[in-house]
Structures are given as structure tokens and as C-alpha cells.
């Protein structure tokens, strides 16, 4: 899988984690001035999972194993327009016929260079929201709820331990 950090994009269209990123295929903690946290979180970004699936689908050294486990279904409702400068939340409804516990992980997939110098509400391309570890909570607030409650909707030039989440003041 390719790296998903966006401070110095690779040419594969998967630079979707602002700054040095936070997932396994990021450079979390390794890029002075671009870190949102000191270490990566133990999960893969959507783009990394897609890379692995694509690779496995195109090699012949594996064998298929039948599983009785069914894939879960999930829906996030209809698409809708979010006014500029507005905090929002995303909500999913998942169902698993095997009654397995479900976790949810909301990730922005926009690829583009996003570093501490250009991150902010006026950014036209790239992710303006970080990936956070999967949880059983099916609702994700953007920016995160403590920032919203403190009136911190727009973030520019984030630093280590900043939320790395902002509303957008431009049409995206």
C-alpha cells in the first residue's frame, strides 16, 4: 500500500491524510512541523485497504477460503449540501446479519497537498478533516464536538495535538 500522508503527496492520488497523517501508512510523528500526533493509530486508511485489495485480487499465490460470515450493510443517507462555515455531523446506520459488533470510521478521501502552511477553511483541494480511529459510535461531528462547543469551527496552521479539522469557507 502507498503512503496516505498529504504534507508531500505521492503521485498515486491517495494523499488524503492532512499533514503527516495518523494511520498505519502515514508518517505520524516522523515529520517535524507536520505532525498531528506522535505515533500512528493501529488501523489502515480506506485508500490503504483499497491498495491491498487491488493487489490481492491480481496475484495468484493465494487461495480462497469460504466463510459463513456475511458482509455488513451500511448507509449514510442521501447526499446533501452543507453551507459554508457550518459545522456538521455524519451518521451511518449499519446492520450485520451475523450480529457482529460494527465499528464506524469516517474519512475524507480528497487527495492533494495539505500541510501546516495551507491547512484551513479556505483550502480548495485535499482533506480538511483527519481520520480518527474506528469506534462503535455511528455519528461523527466535524469539527469534533469539543471544538464546536468551544466555538472553534475554523482552524488554520494546525500544530501538534491540534484537531486538524475545520469547516470549509469555500465551495468544495
Predicted features along the sequence, with ranges:
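Extracellular (secreted or membrane-anchored) zinc-dependent metallopeptidases
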Residues: 1-170
